[in-house]
């Protein structure tokens, strides 16, 4: 039970950080403006993403909300079943849950997701903190599952 409580607190803290950064961006940067943050590496901007990655499927908020809920519920179920597995499995699932819920909050409360990080050195989608959680979480989860498969678990 203690491990579940710790994971729940971590999820809440991660969501809080995501929402705090988004709130700061909305208050400090006008929509569409780009400001250098780490020169030649990352700029900050304020984008209202009404779609998915690379702004695909614009204005399909209900679809994204349903998909997000299904993924988050699935991740919570899988986490519950695998809570005693490797640290990395738990970490990956924790990040996926936090990232999914962070963007879900935006979609339900505002009708769009606030994105802010623009990589200056590559033509890549503008993304947010929750997207980072999701990406890192999926990578960690895949590596953990691959490692378990190799080890025969």
Model-derived regions: residue spans:
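Alpha-helical transmembrane bundles and membrane-interface segments of multipass inner-membrane proteins
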Residues: 1-153
